[in-house]
Every structure is written in structure tokens, then in C-alpha cells.
Amino acid sequence: MNEDELKRLFLYAKKHREEHACGGYPYEHAEILRLFITSTSAKKILELGTGTGYTAAYMASISSDIHIDTIDQDEDHGKIAQSNWEKLGIDQQVRQYLGKAESVLPGLRDIYDLIFFDGYSPSMKFLTHFERLLKKNGILITANMFLKDELGGKYMRALQRSNRYQMGVIEDTTIAIKLFD
């Protein structure tokens, strides 16, 4: 997969969102993901917010050794994403879960090197699952932190108060490194 294919998929995702007035925003700071995936040699990734599949495709393009589990509740987006991954030849790297994250997360048992939340502002109920699913020294990347709340709400404050994470903010994205279990 080359950069032109990823660019086309990104533009398609933007156009789809505009035409359908849906919440499937493509993540605009993918270079942040590349930085943390390559610097930590992340191989097992959990994504919340599949949309049309752009971000999973971007992450899969970094290395054929990367495997992504992705969750989205929109069945139409799931079909579009699956089709996009098949066209790009990365469908074997991505496992898709259709359903609300609140329903899917409790059933997940894998431990992830990196978790990428790209839905609306995250709820506190996700943090417990993230702590369980993220390995020690794993990276939790949360986009759209300020979508509903300029301060990032309770989730951001909980990360700041927690002694389990070292964190920082880049644009609207929070990066948190899990220091211990």
C-alpha cells in the first residue's frame, strides 16, 4: 500500500462524512500514530472508532506484522471499512468488532501494545477497560479530547490524577504511557 492509496482513503472518509453527516471523522494527525507505533514497535493495536477504515489502514501500512482489532457500532461503516481493507490487501491484519464499545470491550481478552480511541470524547467507563487491556509501558492515544469539553472532562482529569500513566497532549490528542499494572 502506498501513500497515494492512503491519501485517497482519507479523502474518501472526509467526503463520506460530509455526504452522510455521520460521525466517521478520519483522524487528521496520523503521523502521531506512526511515531508511537514505530518508536515502541507496537504490533497489537486496539482501535475504537473504525469509521470507513482509514486509520486502521494507515496503522496496518506501517508494518505487515501489525494486527489491529477495531470496534465500531455502525454496520454500514463496517461494510465500507472491510471493503477498503480488502482492496488494499490488509484485511488479514484487521479484525473488526461491530457493536457499541461498552458491549464489546468486556469480552476482549488480548493485551494490546497500543490503544487508539477515535470516537467522541471518551467516557470514564472506558478507562477501566483500557487499564485491563493495555500492557505495561503500552500507549493509550485518545483523540477528540476536547470535542465536548474544553478541558477533556472527567476522563482527562482521571488520567492526570492517576499515578499509572505519564501523559501529555498534542493538538486534541492525549498520549498516555501506562507505567505499571
Task: Label each region the model flagged.
Residues 1-114, 121-141, 145-181:
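A short alpha-helical cap/connector motif
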